Amino acid sequence: MNYKFDIPAQTKSIIKVIGVGGGGSNAVKHMHKQGIKDVEFIICNTDKQALESSTVPNKLQIGADLTEGLGAGAKPERGRQAALESKEDIRNLLNQGTKMLFITAGMGGGTGTGAAPVIAQVAQELGILTVGIVTAPFVFEGKRKREQAEQGIRELSEHCD
């Protein structure tokens, strides 16, 4: 007897890990250096210089027009607007056979706090199983940063499984 198996030829992994902002990008850079296979690692940032200096091969710059390649200045609304500006790029990136997405970000700053919920929303719209893994600021980093982080975590959790 002969058996024939039709195995789909995939060029992209079905599991993606995206690091959003500086903190998330640092986490993904560390994971990428560990040599984990069958996972696609991506860094996403408003800061063009930070993207260019990273060793992670898959990069997505968001909000290039809004931020002119600079960071979000610790302003989550600016990070959110940057992600909305690049929503179709995010959708195209995720719409390449992705079945599961891990979003990692440091909450309390601008890009991670503001953009991670938008990325999760796009993933949710595409029916992708989405997990958020974030860090919160230390108490000594201040009340404002802590409040921004808590708001960002609430928004992110609305779009995560």
Regions found by a protein language model. Give the residues of each.
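Tubulin/FtsZ superfamily GTPase core signature
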Residues: M1-D161
